[in-house]
Amino acid sequence: MKRFSEKVFLQLKMPTEEVPVSDEKRIRLALEALGYEHVNIPLSVMRQLYPLCRNAGFDITVTLVHRETDWAMVRVEAGDTTKEHYALAVDYGSTTIVMELVDMDSGAVIDRVKSVNGQTAYGTDILSRITYTMEAPEHREQIQKATVKTFNSLLVQLAENTGIDAAKCPVMI
C-alpha cells in the first residue's frame, strides 16, 4: 500500500546545450526512474520550477500526494527537506474538533490540540444544525464560516506550539 504522501529528494543534472530538456521533463524522468510513473504537476507548481531549480543547483525536494490512480506534485522546495514530512489528522466531532500534527515518516504525533466545534453556536446537536441551515441560505454560510474559524484556530495553535506551519502538511486526514 502506498502512503498518502511522499517527499522525494532529487539531484537533477544541470541543463546543457547538448541536452535541452525542460526542468519539468527532467523532474518527470527522475521520478519515473524511482517508480513514480504517473505524476500530475499543476500549473501552480510548474511556475515555481524556474528559478527555484537553478537557485538550488538542481537539488530539490518534491512533495507528492497519492490519488486513486496517480500522484500529484503539490510542492517543490530547494535542497533536501525530506525529514520535514508532516500531515494533519482531524477528528471532526459534533461538539469537539481534535487536530494532530503527525510526522509522516515515524508516525509520531508531534502535537495535539482541540477546540469546541464552532458549529455548536447554531445548535447543540447535528439535527438542530441541519434544521438551522434549512431555514435560510445564509445560515449554511454561517455554519461553514464557523467550521473554517475553528479549523484556522487549531492550525494557528499547532504552528505556535511546534513552529511547523500547516502549509508544510500536504495531507489532512
Q: Can you say where each PLM-predicted feature lies in the sequence?
A:
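Extended, hydrophobic alpha-helical segments in both membrane/secreted and soluble proteins
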Residues: 95-99, 109, 151
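N-terminal catalytic scaffold of extracellular/periplasmic and nuclease hydrolases
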Residues: 133, 149-153
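Nucleotide/phosphate-binding catalytic cleft detector across ATP-hydrolyzing
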Residues: 1-89, 94, 106, 140-148, ...
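Short glycine-rich, Thr/Ser-proximal phosphate-binding strand/loop in the N-terminal lobe
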Residues: 101-141
